[in-house]
């Protein structure tokens, strides 16, 4: 179904809509006005081990550590897919990307008229990658996690080997 001529597509700025156009100009997906991120938790494991459900980053890290102490993986995701890595980085870089410098970088990066290749800068990205490095340490992610696909994660979750 081509949505390119619909009222819904007409309500989307071309800057955003262009990212969803196929080579023939058709549009099969529209960007939404919100993007939600969160974690699925195995509440039974939290209750069984009397570990409080996380409400912020600090309590998330504490929960990961508490589960590690009882031999259960606190957190992982389907990092086999590049979009999971990118979504994680996006979530961890929200404060940098919404800063003045971050908005400036995003504007230049996404400008279709910009013919100069825009890479990662040294203002916005160092802190984002430092935060990503800390997240990797806090959650115990390893090289093996890069091979975890959706089915692997679901199986760990269902078998009680994964809390989040």
Model region roles, listed by residue range:
Residues 16, 42, 56-63, 85-88, ...:
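Stable alpha-helical elements in mature extracytoplasmic
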């Amino acid at each position: 179904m081509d949505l390119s001529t619909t009222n819904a597509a007409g309500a989307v700025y071309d800057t955003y809509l262009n990212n969803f156009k196929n080579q023939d100009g058709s549009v099969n997906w529209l960007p939404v006005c919100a993007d939600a991120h969160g974690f699925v938790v195995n509440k039974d494991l939290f209750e069984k081990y009397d570990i409080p459900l996380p409400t912020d980053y600090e309590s998330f890290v504490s929960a990961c550590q508490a589960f590690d102490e009882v031999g259960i993986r606190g957190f992982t995701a389907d990092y086999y897919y590049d979009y999971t890595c990118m979504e994680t980085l996006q979530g961890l870089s929200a404060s940098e990307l919404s800063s003045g410098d971050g908005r400036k970088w995003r504007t230049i990066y996404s400008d279709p008229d910009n013919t100069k290749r825009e890479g990662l800068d040294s203002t916005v990205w160092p802190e984002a990658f430092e935060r990503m490095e800390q997240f990797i340490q806090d959650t115990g992610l390893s090289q093996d996690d890069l091979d975890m696909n959706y089915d692997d994660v679901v199986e760990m979750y269902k078998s009680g080997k994964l809390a989040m």
